[in-house]
Amino acid sequence: MSASRAVLPFALLCLTACATKPPYQARLADTQADCVERFESVRRHPLAVLDAKSRAKAPYVEFADVAQCLRTAQGSTALALYAIDEASRPAQVDISILPSPGGTFAASAELLDARFQRIERHSFAEFTRRGGEYSLSLFLDRAGPVYLMLVPDQDQVGKQESMIGSVNNQMMVPAGPVMFAVNHGAETQTIRAFMAGGRLKVTMRPEGSAAFSH
């Protein structure tokens, strides 16, 4: 057998394996290791105003990758803490959650002051289903909050949404000199679980600018 013939089956096998990507599965943040016991010690992510092009290019990230464990007297919880650029105000923060059959992050958003005291809280029920994502926009005035905190909304974690769709298939059937098209339609149902993890994106824009550009 020539070398080219020997390599061909291997190449086809590799191509098939590389093209087969496992389905997405949301990861949960670790609430056992790397825990801190004070808000001041929680890792912070800077949040500043971006132009429209930069906001559109901003990637979705796993909550587990941006969250850290905070241990309190009530127990341990995973949270993502964003430090808001005060010089950029007034502005608006846009939070986007990407739904997936592998897990949708049921997020609760809280705005905190400089002492990490809650100013306002928004449950996952306040997020709006807009196109292919859940979204929430928060207005920040000049004397507004210093931090944005995202945590799992325990009232929604464990629930699920059901999406109904349809699939249409067409098959061409020969009948002598002509062809007939046979159409077959079927209803589909997609179940998406609300979890304590999933993909999200947080951006900040100038006040009055368009919120979401896709």
Predicted regions, residues:
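Solvent-exposed serine/threonine-rich low-complexity stretches and specific carbohydrate-binding patches
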Residues: 120-129
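Non-catalytic, beta-strand-enriched accessory regions in extracellular/secretory proteins
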Residues: 61-87, 133
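Bacterial N-terminal signal peptides that target proteins for export
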Residues: 1-8
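C-terminal edge strands of extracellular/lumenal beta-sandwich accessory domains
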Residues: 23-66, 153-214
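Noncatalytic modules at the cell exterior or secretory-pathway interfaces
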Residues: 89-93, 139-161
